[in-house]
Regions:
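Flexible coil/loop and intrinsically disordered segments
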Residues: 1-208
């Protein structure tokens, strides 16, 4: 809110495109300069006032695998500093997939629970999967607390069946449900694709 008000206060003429581009830049800075920072994350004051809401994390010519390995520990369940990481990724995915349903009619809502798509404690006699895979970014998505409580121990196919009659809670979740089989290979594939989307946005022009 502070970043938004500062931009509006300093603008002689308020233009929607410029405002949206600035807020996208601020969100990117929050994600990369603070929540996914390798060392101590930047203060909000520095991001908003010192850096003017401009993301200081640059991709430059860094090797993709080096960046992926650097981000991996901070994209693991229990170590993701803020849910804005999921929300910002959903925004990027929405930009890429908004021409097709159901993303075309998707609406961002408040979601506060990080869900394991393959459950931590699967119901019945179903097999558990290896913890590093279970807790990796590829197996995680953001959903409402109510649905997480209701579906937490259900298997992916059961969850997919539930959402056939309900709107997805997140764009990332929708993409996860497109896999015919949700196993370690699918989790790894999806996780790599999602991290690539995050890294690629460092080079991208504003989407607004």
């Amino acid at each position: 809110l502070n970043a938004a008000l500062l931009f509006l206060f300093n603008s002689q003429q308020i233009e929607a495109t410029a405002y949206l581009q600035h807020m996208e830049s601020v969100a990117k800075a929050f994600v990369f300069d603070r929540f996914l920072a390798e060392n101590v994350g930047a203060d909000y004051f520095d991001i908003i006032y010192t850096n003017g809401g401009v993301c200081q994390t640059k991709r430059h010519n860094q090797n993709q695998s080096i960046m992926v390995n650097a981000l991996k520990p901070r994209l693991t369940f229990g170590h993701i500093a803020n849910n804005l990481v999921f929300n910002f990724l959903d925004y990027l995915l929405w930009i890429n997939h908004r021409a097709a349903e159901p993303i075309k009619s998707y609406e961002f809502t408040f979601r506060s629970s990080v869900e394991h798509y393959y459950p931590q404690n699967p119901s019945g006699s179903n097999m558990r999967i290896e913890p590093d895979t279970l807790n990796s970014f590829g197996n995680l998505c953001l959903i409402s607390h109510e649905k997480n409580s209701r579906l937490s121990n259900r298997l992916p196919q059961e969850k997919k069946g539930f959402y056939q009659d309900n709107s997805p809670d997140s764009v990332k979740q929708h993409l996860m449900m497109q896999f015919a089989t949700w196993d370690a290979q699918a989790i790894d594939e999806h996780g790599k694709a999602m991290v690539a989307v995050l890294i690629d946005c460092l080079d991208a022009a504003p989407h607004c």
